[in-house]
UniProtKB/Swiss-Prot annotation:
Protein origin, superkingdom: Eukaryota
Name of the protein in question: Achaete-scute homolog 1a
Entry comment describing in which tissues the protein is expressed: In the 24 hours embryo, expressed in the dorsal hindbrain in two bilaterally symmetrical lines of cells marking the boundary between the alar and basal plates, and ventrally in rhombomere 1 near the floor plate. Also expressed in embryonic adenohypophysis, telencephalon, diencephalon, epiphysis, ventral tegmentum, neural retina and spinal cord, in discrete regions distinct from those expressing ascl1b. In the 30 hours embryo, hindbrain expression is in stripes adjacent to rhombomere boundaries.
Location in or out of the cell: Nucleus
Record-linked InterPro entries: bHLH_dom, HLH_DNA-bd_sf, MASH1/Ascl1a-like
Gene name tied to this protein: ascl1a
Biased composition (Polar residues): 33-44, 159-176
Length: 196
């Protein structure tokens, strides 16, 4: 093939190809201000139009490599749909996790729905309070085991504890005899467990 024939083919290909760069103008319709619009809104519209006027004409590059045997990789719609579905499922699981957490933390059953941040803060406070309760329980148990405290509580106090509505009473408190009355701190901790 001769060089002039190649040039004719490339000229013919250029006739069928869209231009590499073209100018796109935004159509802006100016309308007279209505009687309902104030002068302030008209001046805002004018400022908006002036600020966007440099963008009225801009070069948009459209390159078509199809005639040269090249193609740009296109995102597969199926892959995008699967990715979006995975993200929706992930968000749903996170939201379900927060809903479950709201049910287990104090103030979670209140009328006002707690935000995610409030739920996390409440869970942290709840865990700290439970940890403190366990630490104090371990300290009391260690004191009983070392013999510092003697298990002598009056039967009246045990009966009072059993008669309190909604208060958690251990099964061994009435079965195994009497113990010393609880200190105000220990009583407060028992009251704390009634919140839940």
């Amino acid at each position: 093939m001769d060089i002039t024939a190649k040039m004719e083919i490339s000229v013919n290909q250029q006739q069928f190809m869209p231009p590499a760069c073209f100018f796109a103008s935004q159509s802006i319709q100016l309308s007279p201000t209505d009687s309902q619009c104030s002068n302030k809104s008209a001046s805002k519209q004018a400022k908006r139009q002036r600020s966007s006027s440099p963008e009225l004409l801009r070069c948009k590059r459209r390159l078509n490599f199809a005639g040269f045997g090249y193609s740009l990789p296109q995102q597969q719609p199926h892959a995008v749909a699967r990715r979006n579905e995975r993200e929706r499922n992930r968000v749903k699981l996170v939201n379900n996790g927060f809903a479950t957490l709201r049910e287990h933390v104090p103030n979670g059953a209140a009328n006002k729905k707690m935000s995610k941040v409030e739920t996390l803060r409440s869970a942290v406070e709840y865990i700290r309070a439970l940890q403190q309760l366990l630490d104090e329980h371990d300290a009391v148990s260690a004191a009983f085991q070392s013999g510092v405290l003697s298990p002598t509580i009056s039967q009246n106090y045990s009966n009072d504890m059993n008669s309190m509505a909604g208060s958690p009473v251990s099964s061994y408190s009435s079965d195994e005899g009497s113990y010393d009355p609880l200190s105000p701190e220990e009583q407060e901790l028992l009251d704390f467990t009634n919140w839940f």
